[in-house]
């Protein structure tokens, strides 16, 4: 009798995706982040579901309901902090996953890559809406500042912002719809993840060398299942260490003050994972210009397949490109730091230089360096 694993219509799909999947024999730990992102998404959906059972999306009671979850609900504090810090772990894994894709040239699978970029946008939008829900000072003012950016769109901007707000300011209608969107979006993300995997399995995984590995494949199970379990254990350990020892490390103290439309916090800033984009937004004195730079700072990822001029796929054997890649990483760290600083000298000029450098490295330096390497290697 043939194994049900290979014949059953549903189990067959799982088998071809996670068990009998041919995988390159040399993929490193950098290939673990896909499964870790899946775990993060599962944790976020589960903890979010339990939070939604006790949360109320009304301006009068939202802040109190979060306090109630932390004080009165059984293990509510644990669920709440796992959800808040789970978002941070999600973004750490996302940035490492994207960085891996850039370093090893995984963007040449452009359907997989483009869906990945759309996923990044979706996760960022979902995280932003989630940050508004506790209805603290930073929730309210963050929502006001970021939604207000849409007013920079010519002609329809103001109407669009008021339409999103559901009134003339961020209020009850805004909070209610943000809760609705924050709830639905992770399920849309899950569907997109399946499409992401579908396209990935059309081509098979890339590997550190960037060479075709069809001649040397191994089954995903047990080799990479056991490897993924190690990653999962490390991720859970890191998350729980954060949650149980310093749950507020990455949060903003201002968000423990209930939202007050009459008092603006001295420094409005988003969560750490948006600071690099926030720094780029702030570094341009023009409102529309800033918004465009903000959008293009992420959208630029879609250009990587077009900007790839090297004859080799991976950066593994391209030391000059490696230098420029790590310079880009250092630049992103600089932008993240600047995004959390007040708008004053010398932070303004550092932010502007780092923002220019970000686009120059991607659009100009990396392609030119690739061409130089082609010449040096006589390709």
Curated annotation (Swiss-Prot):
Provide a Gene Ontology MF annotation, just one. Answer: metal ion binding
Q: State if Transmembrane helix is listed as a keyword.
A: yes
- Give residues annotated as binding heme b b562: 83, 182
What is the protein's major site of localization?
Answer: mitochondrion
Q: Which residues bind a ubiquinone?
A: 201
| Pfam assignment, any one | Cytochrome_B
Q: Which residues cross the membrane?
A: 33-53, 77-98, 113-133, 178-198, 226-246, 288-308, 320-340, 347-367
Q: Which cofactor does it need?
A: heme b
Q: Describe its assembly.
A: The cytochrome bc1 complex contains 11 subunits: 3 respiratory subunits (MT-CYB, CYC1 and UQCRFS1), 2 core proteins (UQCRC1 and UQCRC2) and 6 low-molecular weight proteins (UQCRH/QCR6, UQCRB/QCR7, UQCRQ/QCR8, UQCR10/QCR9, UQCR11/QCR10 and a cleavage product of UQCRFS1). This cytochrome bc1 complex then forms a dimer.
Family membership: Belongs to the cytochrome b family.
Its biological purpose is as follows: Component of the ubiquinol-cytochrome c reductase complex (complex III or cytochrome b-c1 complex) that is part of the mitochondrial respiratory chain. The b-c1 complex mediates electron transfer from ubiquinol to cytochrome c. Contributes to the generation of a proton gradient across the mitochondrial membrane that is then used for ATP synthesis.
Protein name listed in UniProt: Cytochrome b
Give the originating organism: Callospermophilus saturatus
Q: Which gene encodes it?
A: MT-CYB
């Amino acid at each position: 009798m043939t194994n049900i694993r290979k014949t059953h219509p549903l189990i067959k799909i799982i088998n071809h995706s996670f068990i009998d999947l041919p995988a390159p024999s040399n993929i490193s730990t950098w290939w673990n982040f896909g499964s870790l992102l899946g775990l993060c998404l599962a944790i976020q959906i589960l903890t979010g579901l339990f939070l939604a059972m006790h949360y109320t999306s009304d301006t009068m009671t939202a802040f109190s309901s979060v306090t109630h979850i932390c004080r009165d609900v059984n293990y509510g504090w644990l669920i709440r902090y796992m959800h808040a810090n789970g978002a941070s772990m999600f973004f750490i894994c996302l940035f490492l996953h994207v960085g891996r894709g850039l370093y090893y040239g995984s963007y040449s699978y452009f359907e997989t890559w483009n869906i990945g970029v759309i996923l990044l946008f979706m996760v960022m939008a979902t995280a932003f809406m989630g940050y508004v829900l506790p209805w603290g000072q930073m929730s309210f003012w963050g929502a006001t500042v970021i939604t207000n950016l849409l007013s920079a769109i010519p002609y329809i901007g103001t109407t669009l912002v008021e339409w999103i707000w559901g009134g003339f300011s961020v209020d009850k209608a805004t909070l209610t719809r943000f809760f609705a969107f924050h709830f639905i979006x992770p399920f849309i993300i899950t569907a997109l993840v399946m499409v992401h995997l579908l396209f990935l399995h059309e081509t098979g995984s890339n590997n550190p060398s960037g060479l075709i590995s069809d001649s040397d494949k191994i089954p995903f199970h047990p080799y990479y299942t056991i490897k993924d379990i190690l990653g999962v254990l490390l991720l859970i350990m890191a998350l729980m260490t954060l949650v149980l020892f310093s749950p507020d490390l990455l949060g903003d103290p201002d968000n423990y003050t209930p939202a007050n439309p009459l008092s603006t916090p001295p420094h409005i800033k988003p969560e750490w994972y948006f600071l690099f984009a926030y720094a780029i937004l702030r570094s341009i004195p023009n409102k529309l210009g800033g918004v465009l730079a903000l959008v293009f700072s992420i959208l630029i990822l879609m250009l990587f397949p077009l900007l790839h001029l090297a004859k080799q796929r991976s950066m593994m054997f391209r030391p000059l490109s490696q230098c420029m890649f790590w310079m880009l990483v250092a630049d992103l760290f600089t932008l993240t730091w600047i995004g959390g600083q007040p708008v004053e000298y010398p932070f303004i000029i550092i932010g502007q230089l780092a923002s220019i450098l970000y686009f120059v490295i991607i659009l100009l330096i990396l392609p030119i360096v690739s061409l130089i390497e082609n010449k040096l290697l006589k390709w």
